[in-house]
Every structure is written in structure tokens, then in C-alpha cells.
Design a protein with these regions (language model features):
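Juxtamembrane intracellular "pre-TM" segments in multi-pass secondary transporters
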Residues: 1-15, 194-226, 411-413
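Intracellular juxtamembrane helix-capping segments at the cytosolic ends
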Residues: 123-136, 326-340
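C-terminal transmembrane helical hairpin of 12-TM major facilitator-type secondary transporters
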Residues: 286-328
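Helix-to-loop junctions at the C-terminal end of transmembrane segments
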Residues: 67-80, 167, 272-285, 371
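Cytoplasmic helix-loop-helix junction between adjacent transmembrane helices
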Residues: 117-151
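C-terminal ends and interior cores of transmembrane alpha-helices
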Residues: 90-104, 295-307
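Symmetry-related core transmembrane helices of the 12-TM Major Facilitator Superfamily/SLC fold
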Residues: 174-191, 380-395
Length: 413
């Protein structure tokens, strides 16, 4: 069935664009995933502190949060292609700084690398949001995010595995390989000449952070359930890619299977993305995402019950499978609202991107602090219990429809 359907998909203009961007992002994010596995272990070994490691990685999101405020004001006329290109250039700089850090592992160099990392990630995020909102019809927003999440999840599944193999060949090898993959992504982007040329149609001539924060305040008062849910999903993700990377390495010292802890966190999105795309959920995305997040938190908390590798892998796989459904559903809600906002959509894109930055500002330092007191394994229990409580409250309080103040939005300049 898939063999017969695939040629028709390639001929479809919308899905052709989705698959093209997905392949480009796969190469870029595979490079990022390799570095994301290596960097927490490298920083923690260099600084000899899980808490300091968390603080350093949190700095990337402090910069990313600032980018969320500034980018909507300065991206006038930028195409998706140009945003991705700038992200690729930032990735090259990030890898180069990390190469320098292997020779001089000083705190200031780590902070500089994290600053570039924060900018790079936000550029890619703005590009993705703009692409889905403009290049796919409303009814396919969740499906588009589901398919793109497959490419993302494949990259982050393979990244830790490849990163572990590369690290065995030397400290610099992961960075060299990441540069090669990023270059391949650049080649694919240059070949996609006609697919991502539509510019962001905004008309802003100055950077006004106070005004942007005021816009966010207005939007938050109307879309707060989805913002809060995004933050806590981001906290889970931040925990896995900091404390989880260290815990995965610790388990791998006991057994080869232990090294699959972090890859199994990313694996479910490979097949869950197909399921979400097939559902084509049009209504009820918010509450459905909250329900899946609730049960994901339960299994995440169960990681603290035992350190047996079999149960560690089982619980993380089930928890991640449930969480993997929530992500594209939540992104679909954002895309629905973005499509209703007209030329002022950039403000909601900035707000949605800021939730990830906030999660990664709080998450690594919070997880690192907990890990320094009760250990990596129990850190997941603490995060899981928090997620269960928050998602339960959201299920009880989320309104059926998120309404925007359209008249007020029309007055924004």
C-alpha cells in the first residue's frame, strides 16, 4: 500500500514540500542529536558537577528566550529557506566552538557555545512554524507536524547511538561528524530552490521588547493552557537531554542495553507520527494532548521504582510513546491559532518558541540540582509526579475553545 501511495505523495505539492523540509531538518538535527548526547557528558566531566552542567546548558535557552523576543521584530521579509540557512550557519559556529572547548574546556567557552546553540535552535523553530502555517492547509496541520516529527525523532533516535560510537574514537570526532552532516543539509537546502521561498509578511521597523512582552501577555491570557502544557513537555525533554544523557551513559557501563535508555526516549515518535498523521485530528486536540501527557507522567514517575535495566527501558518507552502523541497535537493547536492571526502571527510563534526556551532555562538546572541530591534515576520520578499534577489541573480547567481578542490584535503594529 505504501509503495503504491508514495509516488502520489511525491507528486502532491503540499506533501512534497513537507518531505523536502523534513529531509533537510533530518540531517541538521542528526548533527544536533549527536552533539546533544555528547555535550552534557563532556561538560559534566569537565566541570565535575551535574548542577553546573545544568546551569551551563540552561544558558543556551536564556539566549534563546531573548531571541524569541527579538526575532519577531527583525524577521521582516525572511523566507523559510533563509531562516534554515541562518540556522545551518549557526550550527557550523557551534560545532567549531565545541572543537575549541576540547582543547580548552573553560566555562566561558562553554557559555559562548551555548549562546550560539540557543540562537541556532530558535532560527530552526521559527522556520518550521512559518512553514506549517503557510504551506499546509488547516486540516493538515497536525498531520504535517506528525510527519515532520518522524524525521526529527529518527535523528534524535540515531544521534545518541552514533554519538556513543564516535565518542569511542576520540573527543573531537562527534563535532567533526556533526559538521559533515550539517554541510549535507546545506547542500539539500540549496537544491530546494523553489519550495520554500515565501517570505514572512510582516511590517515592523523597530525592536521593542516591552511591546512584544505586552503582546505575549495578551496572548497568554487566552491560550494559557497550551502554553503551560508546552512548558512542562519541554521540562521532560530537557531532563532527558541533560540528566538523561548522563543516566544513559551510566546504564551503558552496566550493559550495552543500558545505552538504549536515551534512544528509546526518542524512538516512539518514529511510529507515533504516522498514527497522528493518519488520525488527522481536527477537534479536541487540547484535551487529548493533556490526557496523553497525564499518563506519560505516571510512567515517567515509575522510573524511580527500580534501577533494573529492563524496567528502565520499558517505562521510558511507554512514557515516551504517550508523550510523543502530545507533541504534534500541541503543535497542531499552535498552528491552528497562528493561521487565524494573519500578519500578527509572528507574536504567537515567538510565544510558542519561548515555552521551549523557558523549559530549557528551568529544566537542566532543576534536573541537575535534583540529580546532585537524590541521583539521576529519582530525578525522573520527581519530574513525572510534577507532570501528573499539572496535567490533571489542566484537564479540569482548560476551556473548550481558545478565543483570541481579534479586535485588539488588529490594532497591533
Amino acid at each position: 500500500m505504501f509503495v503504491k501511495t508514495f509516488p502520489r505523495i511525491l507528486k502532491d505539492e503540499v506533501w512534497s514540500k513537507v518531505l523536502t523540509l523534513g529531509m533537510i531538518l533530518f540531517l541538521i538535527l542528526l548533527a544536533d542529536a549527536i552533539l546533544s548526547f555528547w555535550v552534557p557528558n563532556f561538560i559534566q566531566d569537565s566541570l565535575q558537577s551535574s548542577f553546573l552542567m545544568g546551569l551551563v546548558i540552561s544558558f543556551s535557552s536564556v539566549v534563546g528566550f531573548g531571541a524569541d523576543l527579538i526575532f519577531p521584530q527583525i524577521l521582516r521579509g525572511f523566507t523559510v529557506k533563509r531562516l534554515i540557512l541562518l540556522g545551518i550557519l549557526s550550527s557550523f559556529i557551534f560545532s567549531a566552538i565545541l572543537l575549541g572547548a576540547t582543547a580548552a574546556p573553560y566555562l566561558v567557552i562553554f557559555l559562548l557555545a551555548m549562546a550560539v546553540w540557543g540562537i541556532y535552535y530558535e532560527l530552526l523553530g521559527f522556520g518550521e512554524q512559518q512553514f506549517v502555517a503557510d504551506s499546509t492547509p488547516l486540516r493538515l496541520h497536525s498531520a504535517a507536524w506528525g510527519v515532520m516529527s518522524i524525521f526529527r525523532s529518527l535523528a534524535y533516535f540515531l544521534g545518541p547511538i552514533i554519538g556513543g560510537l564516535l565518542l569511542a574514537r576520540g573527543d573531537r570526532t562527534p563535532a567533526y561528524f556533526a559538521i559533515l552532516l550539517t554541510f549535507l543539509g546545506l547542500v539539500f537546502l540549496m537544491l530546494a530552490r523553489e519550495k520554500h521561498k515565501r517570505p514572512i509578511e510582516i511590517d515592523v521597523h523597530e525592536v521593542n521588547l516591552i511591546r512584544e512582552l505586552a503582546h505575549w501577555k495578551v496572548l497568554f491570557s487566552h491560550v494559557w493552557p497550551i502554553v503551560i502544557m508546552s512548558i512542562f513537555m519541554g521540562l521532560v525533554d530537557a531532563t532527558f537531554w541533560t540528566t538523561g544523557a548522563v543516566w544513559s551513559h551510566t546504564l551503558s557501563e552496566r550493559s550495552w542495553w543500558g545505552g538504549m535508555f536515551l534512544p528509546l526516549y526518542t524512538l516512539p515518535s518514529l511510529f507515533v507520527g504516522f498514527v497522528v498523521a493518519k488520525w488527522q485530528v481536527f477537534e479536541g486536540k487540547k484535551r487529548l494532548a493533556e490526557k496523553f501527557l497525564f499518563f506519560s507522567g505516571i510512567f515517567l514517575a515509575m522510573l524511580g521504582l527500580t534501577d533494573a535495566i529492563f524496567f528502565q527501558l520499558l517505562f521510558v518507552f511507554v512514557s515516551s510513546t504517550l508523550l510523543a502523541v502530545s507533541f504534534p497535537l500541541t503543535d497542531g493547536v499552535y498552528s491552528d491559532i497562528v493561521a487565524r492571526m494573519g500578519r500578527e502571527r509572528r507574536h504567537l510563534i515567538g510565544l510558542s518558541r519561548s515555552t521551549i526556551s523557558i523549559a530549557y532555562i528551568i529544566g537542566p538546572a532543576w534536573a541537575g540540582f535534583i540529580a546532585s541530591t537524590i541521583g539521576e534515576r529519582l530525578t525522573f520520578s520527581a519530574v513525572g509526579i510534577t507532570v501528573v499534577v499539572v496535567s490533571a489541573v489542566l484537564l479540569l480547567t482548560t476551556p473548550k475553545k481558545l478565543k483570541l481578542p481579534q479586535e485588539e490584535i488588529k490594532k497591533w503594529e
